[in-house]
Structure formats: structure tokens, C-alpha cells
Amino acid sequence: MTAQTQELTKAQQYNFNKLQKRIRRNTGQAIADFNMIEDGDRIMVCLSGGKDSFTMLDILMSLQKSAPISFELVAVNLDQKQPGFPEHVLPEYLESLGVEYKIVEEDTYAIVQDKVPEGKTTCALCSRLRRGILYRTAKELGATKIALGHHRDDILETLFLNMFYGGKMKGMPPKLVSDNGEHVVIRPLAYCREKDIIKYSDMRGYPIIPCNLCGSQPNLQRQAVKQMLNDWDKRFPGRIETMFRAMQNVVPSHLADFSLFDFKSIDKNSGVINGGDIGFDKEEIAPQVVEDEDLVMEFDPSLQLNVTNI
């Protein structure tokens, strides 16, 4: 091995350690902020075979070793009998990790193919079937929490999807009770950036399983929103971080949802609420400081985005 190769290896290791530290820190912070994991929890980690769920399991196993509390992890994969699904990959990988796991075999593929007309997206029905099976499995395993691998970009994409197409400000919750009311669902990667996860996954060399084995058409609306956010991230560095921060800094008095704020009872004796109304004056938006790639950068006000032109 040449000195140049050794130096490159050292540089790669340094970058890997830095990236792993950031993902660990972001995951740990999300877990703490939302009280996702408690002492004695048994976490069912849903493993699809994609970069996000592999990274989630990896980081949770790492945090488990140093956490001040005790919790169990059990990795679960649903083999939906899609054609070409490599059944040996996940068992071999999970055996090598020494983590408890369960492979659930359910032929949902045949059901979906029978029920959904050719050419139509199968994702909605497939998702409902998968969700029901995972809920049942969590109960069988005695899991106290169900961990999903959605990251910060997924959460933002869902917010914009709901605003653009659903007419509501609704994202993807870091922690919430499942729709059947029986399980607590957590998203430990809620603070993690997709681009970090992609880099980390490449460095780790996970045995990624393709997500399009079913041949379903992609969700074009989500693809469009994803592309929009990626474009914004390139044109306006730090914009994604600021938008996600906005989800944690909601001011109901300055929106229009009367179920969240009692507008009807306001009179001149109500006092100034959250800075009050400044009439015809345009609000001055103070530049925000964001952290990106561990380098702190201040926004340039000249880059402010005119959303009316999008």
C-alpha cells in the first residue's frame, strides 16, 4: 500500500467518523426531544432493506451500547413475496450483526396484483396491508414501540404534499400512536438529512435491496415535491434546515386555524400576542444561523425565496 493510498484511507476514515458522529448526535437528540425510547422498551425496528432502515438499525445498535437506559431491539422484515426478492440477504446480514430478528412471510404481492388494475399504482393498498401485518407482528413480539426509518426530508416532503394537494399543514410525526390506537410509532431519524444517510449507507456498504421489485408506478406527486426541495437546497443553502425548524416553531395566532387559536374572543383588551399585528408594514425576517456539514453559515437576505414565482 502506497503512502498516498494510506493517506486516502485515513481521510476516508476521518470523514466516516465525522458523518457517523453527526447521525448519532441527530438521532440521539430526536430520541431525547420526543422521549422516543424509555427504559425497558422493546423496539421493533422495521427493516425494508433500504438505506434508511439499515442506517436506523445501525445507529440504534450503536446508541444501545452507550445509552444510560436499557432497551431491546428486534429487527423485523416483511417478505411480501415480490418476484426477485433476495430472501437470503437480510437473514445473513442480521445473523452477522447478532441482533434479534424476525422475517415475516406474507404474500401481499399476489393480493395487490389481483385487486389493483394494471398500470395503476399499488402503493396505497400495499402500504395498508403491510401496516396491518407489522402491527400484528409488534403485538406478537411484545414490542412497546415500532421504529420506522423516515428522515427529515421525508417529513418535509409530506408537509408540502399535504399543503399542495391536501390543503392542510400536516407532516409526518416523529412520535405518535398508530392509526389503530394500539402502538407507539417512532421515527428516530427525524433530524437526519437524507444526503447524510446516502453517504453513510455507501460507506457502510449495506446489502441494499431494490425498492421497485413490485413494478409499481412511482408516486409522481412526491417525486415532484422531492425534486423541488432538492432544487431549493442547491439554490438556497440552509433553506431546508430553516423550513424544518419552522415545523418546530409554529405560531398559531399568526395562522388561520381557529381550532388552534381563539380569534373570536380577541378584543382590544387581549394585549399584544406574539408580537401583535404590524398592519401594513412588512415583517422583517432576521437572518437565521444554520448548521450544515458542521460549518455554521449565516443566510444572505438577498437569497430570500419568492414563493409566488414557484
UniProtKB/Swiss-Prot annotation:
Name the Gene Ontology molecular function terms of this record: 4 iron, 4 sulfur cluster binding; ATP binding; magnesium ion binding; sulfurtransferase activity; tRNA binding
Q: How does it assemble?
A: Homodimer.
Cited Pfam families: ATP_bind_3
Family per UniProt?
A: Belongs to the TtcA family.
Location of the motif PP-loop motif: 48-53
User: Cofactor(s) for this protein?
Assistant: Mg(2+); [4Fe-4S] cluster
Source species: Vibrio cholerae serotype O1 (strain ATCC 39315 / El Tor Inaba N16961)
Annotated GO biological processes are: tRNA thio-modification
Amino-acid positions noted as binding [4Fe-4S] cluster in the UniProt annotation, renumbered to this chain = 123, 126, 214
Give, as in the UniProt entry, the pathway in which the protein acts: tRNA modification
User: Gene name?
Assistant: ttcA
User: Can you list the disulfide-bonded cysteine pairs?
Assistant: none
Annotated keywords:
4Fe-4S, ATP-binding, Cytoplasm, Iron, Iron-sulfur, Magnesium, Metal-binding, Nucleotide-binding, RNA-binding, Transferase, tRNA processing, tRNA-binding
**Cofactor remark from the record:** Binds 1 [4Fe-4S] cluster per subunit. The cluster is chelated by three Cys residues, the fourth Fe has a free coordination site that may bind a sulfur atom transferred from the persulfide of IscS.
HAMAP family attached here? Answer: TtcA
So what does this one do?
Catalyzes the ATP-dependent 2-thiolation of cytidine in position 32 of tRNA, to form 2-thiocytidine (s(2)C32). The sulfur atoms are provided by the cysteine/cysteine desulfurase (IscS) system.
E.C. number, please? 2.8.1.-
Q: State the NCBIfam families in the record.
A: PRK10696.1 (NF007972)
Q: Which Gene3D superfamilies match?
A: HUPs
**What is this protein called in UniProt?**
tRNA-cytidine(32) 2-sulfurtransferase
* Superkingdom of the source species: Bacteria
Q: What class of enzyme is it?
A: transferase
Substrates-to-products reaction catalysed: cytidine(32) in tRNA + S-sulfanyl-L-cysteinyl-[cysteine desulfurase] + AH2 + ATP = 2-thiocytidine(32) in tRNA + L-cysteinyl-[cysteine desulfurase] + A + AMP + diphosphate + H(+)
Where does the record place it?
Cytoplasm
Other notes: The thiolation reaction likely consists of two steps: a first activation step by ATP to form an adenylated intermediate of the target base of tRNA, and a second nucleophilic substitution step of the sulfur (S) atom supplied by the hydrosulfide attached to the Fe-S cluster.
Q: Name one GO cellular component term.
A: cytosol
Task: Give the primary localization class.
Answer: cytoplasm
